[in-house]
Curated annotation (Swiss-Prot):
Protein's name in the database: Endonuclease G, mitochondrial
Residue interval of the organelle targeting sequence: 1-48
Similarity field: Belongs to the DNA/RNA non-specific endonuclease family.
CDD domains reported for this sequence: NUC
Active site: 143
Organism name: Bos taurus (Bovine)
Post-translational modifications: GSK3-beta-mediated dual phosphorylations at Thr-130 and Ser-290 is necessary for its interaction with YWHAG and the induction of autophagy.
GO cellular component, one term: nucleus
Assembly: Homodimer; disulfide-linked. Homodimerization is essential for its activity. Interacts with YWHAG.
Enzyme Commission number(s) from the entry: 3.1.30.-
Predominant localisation class: mitochondrion
Site (Essential for catalytic activity): 112
Pfam families: Endonuclease_NS
């Protein structure tokens, strides 16, 4: 656990709940077609809230006037056939990706051999990764929403190959321990009515020889794609009786012995919330009323 312990107290802060609810209502009103968004029990989203008027502000002034020429940036939400993603243009990758797993979605006509990694043209060219960034880097293009989770249609699987759904991942991790965690997530669809998965990168601090803590990470390619120090995966599990269970994992972006049980990588959800700036528990409790968090050693 030494690989995990040092960094899991980084507090980036997040005031996300009200903005998420506002965005949710706007999205529901704008699009009546049922989809993944309408079924999510939790939506940790760093969306921009509306700009309220300020009493006593001079005529022609106030927050609304400040946005006259637009705001330089707000959270970039992207809804795909198989997942919802919040994009971080600074790192050239996702803040988080949320997907829903059900048994019927794990089988179908989706064929990985027909897929290719491709740029996300919905992201400005200044802020997106390219395949050239990964070439010769020594890192895999590691899926956040796994391709094997979405065999139900070729389009759903194709969408997992956007580079916005990818992060630089150490090959040994990607192909072994992380792959085992993805397989385990899929296996839970045999036990639970719904399995919601939220996956994302972490950039955790380390204490160095001078006794000070620093957040340092490598970047690759001409677009400076950030290499996460760790990855998290949060599983929100709906049992048939309505109970909600939560399992939250963190793995270092480094070779991990796949013989180590996955339980070893369970962490308290609070550590991920503090480190990522995201909130899960308040939104889940607002919808479910109760929650059972599974941690290492718990039954």
């Amino acid at each position: 656990m030494q690989l995990l312990r040092a960094g899991l107290t980084l507090a980036l802060g997040a005031g996300l709940g009200a903005a998420a609810e506002s965005w949710w209502r706007q999205r529901a009103d704008a699009r009546a077609t049922p989809g993944l968004l309408s079924r999510l029990p939790v939506l940790p989203v760093a969306a921009a809230a509306g700009l309220p008027a300020v009493p006593g502000a001079p005529a022609g002034g106030g927050p609304g006037e400040l946005a006259k020429y637009g705001l330089p940036g707000v959270a970039q939400l992207k809804s795909r056939a198989s997942y919802v993603l919040c994009y971080d243009p600074r790192t050239r990758g996702a803040l988080w990706v949320v997907e829903q797993l059900r048994p019927e979605g794990l089988r179908g006509d989706g064929n990985r051999s027909s897929c290719d990694f491709h740029e996300d043209d919905s992201v400005h060219a200044y802020h997106r990764a390219t395949n050239a960034d990964y070439r010769g880097s020594g890192f895999d293009r590691g899926h956040l929403a796994a391709a094997a989770n979405h065999r139900w249609s070729q389009k759903a699987m194709d969408d997992t190959f956007y580079l916005s759904n990818v992060a630089p991942q150490v090959p040994h991790l990607n192909q072994n321990a992380w792959n085992n965690l993805e397989k385990y997530s899929r296996s839970l669809t045999r036990t639970y009515q719904n399995v919601y998965v939220c996956t994302g990168p972490l950039f955790l601090p380390r204490t160095e020889a001078d006794g000070k803590s620093y957040v340092k990470y490598q970047v690759i390619g001409k677009n400076h794609v950030a290499v996460p120090t760790h990855f998290f995966k949060v599983l929100i599990l709906e049992a048939a009786g309505g109970q909600i269970e939560l399992r939250s994992y963190v793995m270092p972006n480094a070779p991990v012995d796949e013989a180590i049980p996955l339980e070893h990588f369970l962490v308290p959800i609070e550590s991920i919330e503090r480190a990522s700036g995201l909130l899960f528990v308040p939104n889940i409790l607002a919808r479910a009323g109760s929650l059972k968090a599974i941690t290492a050693g718990s039954k």
